Structures are given as C-alpha cells and as structure tokens.
C-alpha cells in the first residue's frame, strides 16, 4: 500500500492514467479540485494502474502549496482541449502546471455557472483562465465569424491587460493561420486606438472597465457580447478597491441586455473571479455576478503568511518624513553597485515618482555611485513608470525593466498588482500604502517564482500606526527593524540634488499633501504633524526655513480641512487667510485631532464600506447621482473629490497626486491646471484618462490641479 501511495504523489501518476486510457479506451474525467481521476465503474482496474485517490486528496489538503508535478499533457485525457493548445504550450516550453492551474482549469471547463479562485499573484493564474477561453474560441468559429465574442477578460489596469494579452500569445504563437483566425484577440484600454467594431470578428476581448463600459453603451457593439462563453474578472479585489463597483454594475446590466441578440438564447456564459484576497466585498460581488451556487477554489495555504514567505521584510524607522527620503536615497546609493541589485521604489503620487526619478538621474550623472561600472558591467537602468506617461512610453519601460537584470524602477501603485518582473531583489516603499492589501501586493513584486527578495519600508515616527495596522490586521512579521541615524559628517546628497528640481518639488509637495489627507483618516495619523513634517522636507531641500507653498483656498479648507490660522504658517493663498475663521473650534478639531472621526477621513479608499470596498446590488444606480475617481464619468450634480462625493456642487476633475479631487467651474470661468495627454476613455466621460497640459485662469488668479489617480484604467 505504501508503494501505491508513493505512486500517487509522483509525476508517474499522469503517465499511468494516460496509459490506462489508451489501453481501455474509456473516458477519464480530470477533477482539478482534487487532482484525481474519476474512473467509470465498468473499467477493471489493474494493480499497475491503481491509484490511491485518498492519498492524493490528503496530500493536497495537508499542503496545497506543495503540489505534485502534473504536466499539461495530462489534460488530454479529458478530451476537452484542442491539440493546438498543447502544441502552443510545448512551443512555449511550458511543461508542468502550477497549483492554480491544476486546481482551476478543469473546474472552469466543467462548471455550469462559475468559479471563485483565490490565488496569489505570480502563481500562473492567467494561464489558468486563458486555456478555457482559448478552447471556447476554437470550438465556436462560426459564431466568431458572425461577429460574436467568445471570451471576455476584465482587468483593473491597462498594464495588466497587456500582460494578460502576452500570456494568451504564448499559447497562440507558432500556430496555424486557421487557429489564429479562430482566436483573434483584441485589447480595449485607454491610451490606445479602439480597433473593435461589429465586423472585427473578435474571439477574445481583454479590457479595462471604463473602456469596456463605453463599448457596451454603444448599441451597435452590444450584440457582439450576446454569445459569450466565459467572462473573467482578474484581480477582482483590486477592481473593487479602486472603486470600479458602479462600472462593473453597468457592465453586468449591459451583458444581460446583450442576451436578447444571442444566436443561441439558451446559452449562459460562465463567470470566473480570480483574486488574491476573498473578503466580504468579493463574496458579495460573486453572488451578484454568478449567484450563490459557485465553486470556491482556494490555492493559498491556510497556514501561509499573508505575504510571501521568501520575502525578508524590514522596517527602517526614521524621526521624520525628511529623514525617510534621505535614508531611502542613501540606501539605494549604497546598494546600487551590488551585482544583483534590481529594485522597485514605490511612491504614492505621480509627481513624487517624477521628482524622485529626476534626483536619481542626477546622482547617476554626477557619479555619486560607480555608474559607469553599473551600466557597462551590469546593464543598469534607472526607469520610471506612472499614469501620466503615454501608453507607448509605459510599454517601453515595462519591456526594458523586464530585460534588465540590474537597476531601479521608480513607480506609483500602477505596478503594484499584476505586472510581473523577473529577478527583483528589493522592493522599497517610501510611505504608508492606501490600504493594507496594497502593501501586500507591492512587496509581492519580489520573490517571484520561488526566488528570494527583500522588502524595506522607510517609515517616520508620525506614520508608525500604519505598521501597527499591518501587524494587527495581517500578522505581518518584520524580520529586521532598524533605526536610521544620520551621519552628520556625510554630505546630504538628496538635499543638494533635490534643490535643482524646485518646480518638480513644489508639484510633489502639493500632491503629497493630498495623499496625506487621504491616509491620515484611514490610519488616524495626526494630520497637523504630517503637514509639519512635509514642510520640513520642503524647506530643508530649498534651504529656506520659512518657505511657503502657493495653493488655492479650497485646497486648504476642503482637502486638508485646515483652519486659516494654522495654514498661514505654511501656505500662501490669493487674498490671504481670514483669521476669524480659526475661531471655529469644530473645524480646528477636525484638522488637529489625532485622526478624527470617520467623517474626517480626508479622501480615503473607504467608498463602499468599512473594508474600503463593497458591491451592493440594492444601492440605487443613477448616472447623475455618482461621482467617480479615474476612468469614470464625473458627476454634474455633486461636489466630487476623487473617490467621495460631498454636497450638491461639482468640482469635477481637480486632482492631487494619483487621486482625483475635482476640476472647479464657476459659470464661464474655470480654474485649474492639468498635465499629460488627455484621452477620453468613454464617449460620455468628461475627464477620465486625463492629461493634457493646460492652464486656466480664474479671475486674475491662476491655480493648479493635478493628474488623476494613477493605478487606474488609464
């Protein structure tokens, strides 16, 4: 019996079953959830081929992350996949399935309604849903030729959508022209021309929510989605985190409407949700899109830590935000000449990313490290990635960082989820993340595919409540805890280099303060202390202890909720501050209190419930009664600040950092400034996928607004 049990755990299992299939000509059904084979009772078993199913099941339940090796060719026994799929896998040198693929592929094929799959990033989940989608396209070429899409994949960002497309291409490359014709794939994202039209004969569509919603609102395009076989939501938790719930609700309604045009009215598509976390919001979303009868597939060990066990996490404690930036800069300069140093540096805003990138570039030009050796010997690169960049520029950056084995990528949260880079040795975070889940996914950019990596967060004393939240809510264990002590004899390179970028520094401070207003409410930071620390950094770099920042009055009162008497120390506003307003003790409390009430959250991500996201079907859904951050239309009936709506006025598209805070309009006068290229992500939207550099005047005063939230469907 021990011999039989060992056979069940070895790779010979699949070959034996295939041999039995050839010998008896019987149908074998592969159960991915158990990784076992169901034998028809009419088949006589032989000792050689006998498999201890209980041993296999017990092995999986005891250690689901340590799977036995199962080759993709084992799926042939199910007779549910076209041979061209296995040819594509073979040509791409993909031999064995990961745990996610073993557990999810066949349930996706067999389900009548849908599946919810919990899997960490970097575990091969894209291929797990790619194979069923490709098979559906191969089985229904007649419908595709009649303009009917067979599979739809929805991703939260355009970078992730492009990465998903690349995974599909791995299977579809080196195929015959006939296979290519049956599996024609389209990507619908912002910043790229939409080539999808009713006569396009698309088989598979990969889209971001905003662009997909715009397509579905076009009556000419709606029939194309009438005969879907699969609908996949990748990174479902992030879709909800970023406030896409209303957009997903519209997508759901429009897909139901499309059924009226179905070639096969009785056909019902299957839905698959892939998510790194499955909380109440994801569960409610699954109930609304699939129903309560779905299969839940957990590919995460119940005893595993929330973050990857191969990541060496460490804290670098500093006394101030100024020290955090100096310490991180010194850390990079001290390690950038290491042979295998390949780091991702996360900052919370676009302008912060741009500023830090410029300072690193100056350090390279001034040879503050051995840049010649790093470049010539290791091929080192210093790159940036954020949402203000054009799509072509972002694509080039992603390709370059994937190719290089050495260097630094400075980026916003746009790269925190989905994007897969090989051999990242370090993840460096400069500030608290907007949510605990964001922190988890950022550090997940290192230690991919069984490798090891380091994650360092530079955190100031006023921000320590974020670390406490990580430890309390997710049980994060930091294996290294270091206190930064500045060497007073060493030159302050960050201050000197940063002073050359004064304009970029001012833009950075404005957006950073908007971000601080958001997270202060989430983690109950002392906002007064955060503002003081931010200006200490600003004044230190400028070497001006009394430097002030010019902002609009509403930025102080609405974004920071700061009394005029306190704000006068830091800000210049047109016409000055009305000091009498500082006697309003209530307003003073909301700013100076240690975190404040829920109503004083600033602009947190908590739009849809206590967890920061939810999906509630019963909530009224009216285009004129909602405000959106990125990739959604902006309300004309409400005053909108990024992801929250307040009152009855509209302040449209004014944005600070990576979150939108409104564009103010008063009659025929407008007030604001935005950066980048503007590309409307839907026909009815006033401002998503913004950019454009334009400066408008309000009366005699000129004021600034900044790009929208970066980690969106751009």
From Swiss-Prot:
> Function of this protein?
ATP-dependent RNA helicase required for mitochondrial splicing of group I and II introns. Also required for efficient mitochondrial translation.
Protein name per UniProt: ATP-dependent RNA helicase MSS116, mitochondrial
Q: What's its EC?
A: 3.6.4.13
Can you say where in the cell this protein is located?
Mitochondrion matrix
Q: What is its main location?
A: mitochondrion
Feature: transit peptide: 1-37
Task: Provide ranges: composition bias, Basic and acidic residues.
Answer: 619-640, 656-671, 679-697
Recorded domain comment: The Q motif is unique to and characteristic of the DEAD box family of RNA helicases and controls ATP binding and hydrolysis.
Extract the ranges annotated as region (Disordered).
Answer: 581-714
Nucleotide-binding as UniProt keyword: yes
Q: What is the source species?
A: Meyerozyma guilliermondii (strain ATCC 6260 / CBS 566 / DSM 6381 / JCM 1539 / NBRC 10279 / NRRL Y-324) (Yeast)
